């Protein structure tokens, strides 16, 4: 019971602060400096739980304020903070409730079976290809038998290409929208072709 209460309070705090203070947070990030780095990481972490601000906007803002290289590691750090926190909340605070919800959707249970069978590859490819929403993947992995360190490193590696592409594409969006769309579209196309050629079985949902 205590774990559930703590989990609920954490989620409410993250969403409330992020939602009601998002404009102030964005202004703080634009100001630059050490505190703006912290604000950016916390806002991205909150965004994992609830899309307070479009992820691409935060990534682009980080690139513009801190530079592409710094923007990438700041965005990645914030994203991983939110990701691992949600994973642990799903595993230890809301496991029973979330399990009942997942059981109502056979397709999601099939994906969970894939995570249990080949955890690192499944999580890695799930990050590279956003077939499953990130929030849903975090919860499913928290409910599954995936070890936290496997989930962490697979997510870390899998998030890097997307964050790099989104940061670069987002930073150029105002000056060249076509270029930004082309960069991200090409990235998605390449990944899809790799999966189709090398891992076609991972595109199929197992039948019961």
From Swiss-Prot:
<keyword id="KW-0472">Membrane</keyword>
<keyword id="KW-1003">Cell membrane</keyword>
<keyword id="KW-0812">Transmembrane</keyword>
<feature type="transmembrane region" description="Helical">
    <location>
        <begin position="69"/>
        <end position="89"/>
    </location>
</feature>
<dbReference type="GO" id="GO:0005886">
    <property type="term" value="C:plasma membrane"/>
</dbReference>
<feature type="transmembrane region" description="Helical">
    <location>
        <begin position="41"/>
        <end position="61"/>
    </location>
</feature>
<feature type="transmembrane region" description="Helical">
    <location>
        <begin position="150"/>
        <end position="170"/>
    </location>
</feature>
<feature type="transmembrane region" description="Helical">
    <location>
        <begin position="5"/>
        <end position="25"/>
    </location>
</feature>
<feature type="transmembrane region" description="Helical">
    <location>
        <begin position="176"/>
        <end position="196"/>
    </location>
</feature>
<keyword id="KW-1133">Transmembrane helix</keyword>
<dbReference type="InterPro" id="IPR015414">
    <property type="entry name" value="TMEM64"/>
</dbReference>
<dbReference type="InterPro" id="IPR032816">
    <property type="entry name" value="VTT_dom"/>
</dbReference>
<dbReference type="Pfam" id="PF09335">
    <property type="entry name" value="VTT_dom"/>
</dbReference>
<protein>
    <recommendedName>
        <fullName>Uncharacterized protein YqeD</fullName>
    </recommendedName>
</protein>
<feature type="transmembrane region" description="Helical">
    <location>
        <begin position="123"/>
        <end position="143"/>
    </location>
</feature>
């Amino acid at each position: 019971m205590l774990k559930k209460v703590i989990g609920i309070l954490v989620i409410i705090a993250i969403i409330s602060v992020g939602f009601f203070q998002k404009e102030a947070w964005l202004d703080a990030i634009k100001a630059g400096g050490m505190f703006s780095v912290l604000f950016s990481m916390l806002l991205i972490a909150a965004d994992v739980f609830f899309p307070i601000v479009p992820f691409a906007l935060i990534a682009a803002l980080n690139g513009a304020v801190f530079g592409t290289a710094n923007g990438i590691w700041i965005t990645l750090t914030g994203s991983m903070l939110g990701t691992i926190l949600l994973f642990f909340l799903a595993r230890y605070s809301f496991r029973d409730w979330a399990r009942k919800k997942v059981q109502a959707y056979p397709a999601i249970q099939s994906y969970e079976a894939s995570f249990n069978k080949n955890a690192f590859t499944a999580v890695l490819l799930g990050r590279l290809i956003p077939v499953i929403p990130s929030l849903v993947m975090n919860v499913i992995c928290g409910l599954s038998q995936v070890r936290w360190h496997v989930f962490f490193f697979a997510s870390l590696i899998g998030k890097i290409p997307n964050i790099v592409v989104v940061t670069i594409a987002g930073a150029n969006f105002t000056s060249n929208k076509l270029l930004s769309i082309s960069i991200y579209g090409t990235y998605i196309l390449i990944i899809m072709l790799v999966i189709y050629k090398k891992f076609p079985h991972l595109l199929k949902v197992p039948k019961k």
